[in-house]
């Protein structure tokens, strides 16, 4: 009912920051996201004809490679409801609580960024995360079509104009 009202009001797309497909990771990060509710929302938005730009974050301190595979499974199970994907690698904010509890360093000498490189508690380093995203997740037969239709320089401001591409490619 709510999603149909959104569509009727002119909503063409919603960006949903689901972050992870593993409930334990979401709970450890205090995200307040329930995967059963996220699943129901994806289905309801699809039925209403509203495109979904799903945001998933990999390499957070509580995530393991096995957890990332569960996120892949979540995306695959919901692939018909996800129009576009934003797959990101976690950046550790320099002054965060996590930064104080992890072994950190600058990304490179002279780095003035707001983020720090860190030693992942489970050994799930950025290179491993990047390889997982590029070589496994993006190449999965259910995920690859979503990646292909997601514009390269995509921003949520422009996404509604590309919603019609949902079933192409």
What are these regions (language model features)?
Residues 2-169:
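A structural motif corresponding to the C-terminal lobe/cap of the Radical SAM core domain
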């Amino acid at each position: 009912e709510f999603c149909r009202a959104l569509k009727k009001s002119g909503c063409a797309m919603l960006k949903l920051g689901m972050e992870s497909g593993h409930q334990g990771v979401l709970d450890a990060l205090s995200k307040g996201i329930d995967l059963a509710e996220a699943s129901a929302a994806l289905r309801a938005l699809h039925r209403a004809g509203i495109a979904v730009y799903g945001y998933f974050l990999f390499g957070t301190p509580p995530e393991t490679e096995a957890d990332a595979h569960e996120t892949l499974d979540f995306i695959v199970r919901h692939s018909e409801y996800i129009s576009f994907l934003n797959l990101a690698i976690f950046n550790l904010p320099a002054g965060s609580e996590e930064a104080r509890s992890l072994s950190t360093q600058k990304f490179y000498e002279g780095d003035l960024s707001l983020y720090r490189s860190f030693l992942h508690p489970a050994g799930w380093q950025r290179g491993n995360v990047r390889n997982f995203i590029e070589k496994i997740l993006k190449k999965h037969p259910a995920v690859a079509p979503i990646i292909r239709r997601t514009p390269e320089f995509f921003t949520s401001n422009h996404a509604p104009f590309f919603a019609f591409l949902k079933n192409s490619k």
